[in-house]
Amino acid sequence: WDLWLGPAPKRPYHPDYQPFKWRGWLDFGTGALGDMGCHTVNMPFMALELRDPIAIEAEVHGLTKEAYPKQSVIRYSFPERNGLRPLVMYWYDGGLKPSPDILDGRELPGSGVAILGEKGRMFSPDDYCSTYELLPKEDFANFQKPAPSLPRSPGHAEEWLRACKGGEAAMS
């Protein structure tokens, strides 16, 4: 236990920290956004060339001195980027969700990404954006998926090892 605590202040073991819940404690983790955000928002960050937001606003519920909020909605404002219009991105967690209207009234899953555009919406129903659908479906019935334009990852561990050996930097 002492080894696991590392630089965190010493405290007795409690089952609220292990095996998974450590992520939500300020001394140990980064909350839902830090834990899963790097996976969930990777697709919009890469596709829309998002970098540094110019404003961030947060609405939080259940905030304590020791843990991340139980729920939050975070609004990120991004400026124009390489000819792309400014945009706003929202992060929801703790069971909070946007309006089901973004999926034409269907129930929203517990995780996912939705990109709302002028001509339609792109929705990925999981943490890793491994699949997606274009909505409304009838508007994209003849859509042809483009050929992959980014290099495929051999996996986090392999990328890390290659980078350590002086190879290309990891995609992450």
Positions of predicted regions on the chain:
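Contiguous beta-strand/loop segments that form the cofactor/metal-binding neighborhood of enzyme cores
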Residues: 1-30, 34-172
